[in-house]
Amino acid sequence: MRTLWIVAVLLLGVEGSLVQFEMLIMKVAKRSGLFSYSAYGCYCGWGGHGRPQDATDHCCFVHDCCYGKVTDCNPKTASYTYSEENGEIVCGGDDPCKKQVCECDRVAAICFRDNIPTYDNKYWRFPPENCQEEPEPC
């Protein structure tokens, strides 16, 4: 319970895309990004290096690459708009940078959903020293 309280307090100080990304993951993949993907494999969570360990970790690798292509705003804090139409997430708004961040998050959430069968608990809190291989290019 204490951990949940700490997480809640930390989230209060975070605005924009990271909170929205969590909400998209919950809406699309029906899982908590925080408790399922924040420390998974070599790429899910802060930073990322080495080779993705499985298809789920590869979703995070692609998401990191997508964020790396965002240049006109900070993808971790840019607040964007989206809607749901016929069961699909549609990114909106007039700001192309924020829309790009939304697309990165949308694609990752769909990837997580589509790869739920590949999720392997052995990659949760995967030791970083196991992520030393040369990464593939974005």
Swiss-Prot record:
One of its GO terms (cellular component) is extracellular region. It is found in: Secreted. The keyword Secreted applies. Pfam families: Phospholip_A2_1. GO terms for molecular function: calcium ion binding; calcium-dependent phospholipase A2 activity; phospholipid binding; toxin activity. Optimum temperature is 37.3 degrees Celsius. Expressed by the venom gland. InterPro entries: PLipase_A2, PLipase_A2_Asp_AS, PLipase_A2_dom, PLipase_A2_dom_sf, PLipase_A2_His_AS. Residues 1-16 form the signal peptide. Keywords: Calcium, Disulfide bond, Hemostasis impairing toxin, Hydrolase, Lipid degradation, Lipid metabolism, Metal-binding, Myotoxin, Platelet aggregation inhibiting toxin, Secreted, Signal, Toxin. Its EC number is 3.1.1.4. It comes from the Eukaryota. The active site is at H63, D105. Its cofactor is Ca(2+). Ca(2+) binds at Y43, G45, G47, D64. GO terms for biological process: arachidonate secretion; lipid catabolic process; negative regulation of T cell proliferation; phospholipid metabolic process. Belongs to the phospholipase A2 family. Group II subfamily. D49 sub-subfamily. This is Acidic phospholipase A2 CoaPLA2. It comes from Crotalus lutosus abyssus.
